[in-house]
């Protein structure tokens, strides 16, 4: 895991397996089926990395030989909140890693001015719960920042929120950081820039279209 000095709350997951799978996802000739499988696999690997600092407590258990105080994750079940629609493809990998997690959804689409328009919010109970929000792309950063706003407006503090994405543009990371300096943003790659259509370069195309086999 590495950081970029420009963005204190950005963490780049540079594990070789994550980078290998991301390269195959970038390939324009990768099929929808393979893209979907790779998204699940890479999200599972990234989920392992971002959960390494979850709070721990102990529980009394009886092994076949003795009783011991053994470590377990403290607090309530985690919640996974994909940002629709492409974020849904990431929730499968996280649920494979954390099958007991609760799942919410935030529906946001990008208007012509690239600003987010919210159309759906469904969340589990919020008190004392850690939330992992996910969306493959942080391009302009407005949708990611808006999704965090949704939870903060409902009283969830930044220290109980984290955002997981595959690739991000510096412009979007700056927007996210300015809006939420207290929320950690985890990505597999910080790419070069946004083009004139607000697509990430080099990026991987439209993640939703590639995931679901649709045309923009």
From Swiss-Prot:
This is Uracil phosphoribosyltransferase. GO terms for molecular function: GTP binding; magnesium ion binding; uracil phosphoribosyltransferase activity. The keyword Ligase does not apply. GO terms for biological process: UMP salvage; uracil salvage. Keywords: Allosteric enzyme, Glycosyltransferase, GTP-binding, Magnesium, Nucleotide-binding, Transferase. Pfam families: UPRTase (PF14681). HAMAP family: Upp_B. CDD domains: PRTases_typeI. Uracil binds at residues 200, 205-207. 5-phospho-alpha-D-ribose 1-diphosphate binds at residues 85, 110, 135-143, 206. Catalyzes the conversion of uracil and 5-phospho-alpha-D-ribose 1-diphosphate (PRPP) to UMP and diphosphate. It comes from Burkholderia pseudomallei (strain 668).
